[in-house]
Amino acid sequence: PTGKEIHLTIRSQLILDVDEKVNVDISKQEGAGEKEIISAKISDINANQNVRINGTVVRVFPPAFYDCCPQCSRKAANDKCSDHGDVKSAPAIVFSFVLDDGTETVRCTAFRKIGEQIAGLSAKDAKEKSENPVLLQEEIDNNILGCVIEIEGSVKDNKQFDRMEINISSANTNLNPITIAKQLTSK
């Protein structure tokens, strides 16, 4: 076949801006797309895996913030989005913590809505409260420190700090202890 081949990710967007008719054949490559999510212990995780882990939040780091486009959630410096031009940017949160599952610990990072869910605060409220970082940290600690949560995310090898880390794609902060006990005793 003749033509051009373009490789896209799940977040890619292809916009055709041509006058002539274009025949587009979209096919998914074998093995491409979402990786299988595996339930794992922290001691067993490896880079490039998508994992589901239950654990206790044992350390919480102060959140970071950046401005994002309200339409696409990408970073918007000085109220300018690379895709949407001038926008009224909204604060977005980056929230990190350490999760312990009894086998090891791992640093986990959540962005935007998932970060808000885990921290128990909206990015807007957290950013406003960040003017008093001690009170903000205390509130977040009270919301999540010591809680058992389930996360799903992709494992990354942080070579700078020589450790595995997880970028969270979803989180469940309302686990049922009876269900967890049944899962643990059935293994």
Model-flagged regions — what are they?
Residues 1-187:
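Single-stranded nucleic acid-binding proteins centered on OB/S1-type folds
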